[in-house]
Amino acid sequence: MEFNGNLNAGSCSRSKKSHRQKQQQPQPQPQQHIEEIKYVGVRRRPWGRYAAEIRNPTTKERYWLGTFDTAEEAALAYDRAARSIRGLTARTNFVYSDMPRGSSVTSFVSPDESQRFISELFNPPSQLEATNSNNNNNNNLYSSTNNQNQNSIEFSYNGWPQEAECGYQSITSNAEHCDHELPPLPPSTCFGAELRIPETDSYWNVAHASIDTFAFELDGFVDQNSLGQSGTEGFNSLPSTFFYQ
């Protein structure tokens, strides 16, 4: 019985040791295949940043473009320098609309092109031209031509009618265009002004009316029935200047 107990204890200790050894062994980690895109004119520094430089084909000199945090920023800096130096013959990292096909290393569109596309999408040229034309039309002055005197009168578009629109002309300013004039107004008599009536056939000439034909003097009221048949006798034998025939 004791022999069996020792065997069981030894087997348990061995199993525990083997289990511990398995746990201590490092497990193989899956290999991560990260392929970085190789851009033209870009180099990675040991501390993790990216440097960009370009070589001038005519002078055989290298120009330092700077150090950037990402490879895309360094590649964009190289493209800008290459396009300015070499023009359409430059080898770029991104695709540009004005460059020939196959001139880029990658098939990615340049960030500069995407920004320009977005700006044109939200602000199309037709809309910008329409907006500018509306602003110019609102700021301009409008003109209206008078058909009679053919004088252009400039006015601001404020909704008020002008002289040319109403067609009104003063008599004094445009007397040569009128066939006839209105008669003059009579003078005002509010403040005691003397009213003179023109001497025409349609009015009575009071000045030439003779009062002598109606002149007579009456000393009193005389009844016609009390007159005698004789036209030469006076009333009650009193002298009078009134006679009848």
Swiss-Prot record:
Annotated family: Belongs to the AP2/ERF transcription factor family. ERF subfamily.
Start and end residues of each stretch annotated as Disordered: 1-34, 127-148
Annotated GO MF terms: DNA-binding transcription factor activity; transcription cis-regulatory region binding
Alphabetical keyword list: Activator, DNA-binding, Ethylene signaling pathway, Nucleus, Transcription, Transcription regulation
Subcellular location: Nucleus
Origin: domain of life: Eukaryota
InterPro entries per record: AP2/ERF-transcript_factor, AP2/ERF_dom, AP2/ERF_dom_sf, DNA-bd_dom_sf
One protein family per Pfam: AP2
Coiled coil: none
Compositionally biased spans, kind Low complexity: 23-32, 131-148
Name of the molecule in the record: Ethylene-responsive transcription factor ERF087
Compositional bias (Polar residues): 1-12
Keyword Transmembrane helix belongs to the record: no
PROSITE patterns: AP2_ERF
GO cellular component annotations of the record: nucleus
Species for this entry: Arabidopsis thaliana
UniProt-listed GO biological process terms: ethylene-activated signaling pathway
Biological function: Probably acts as a transcriptional activator. Binds to the GCC-box pathogenesis-related promoter element. May be involved in the regulation of gene expression by stress factors and by components of stress signal transduction pathways.
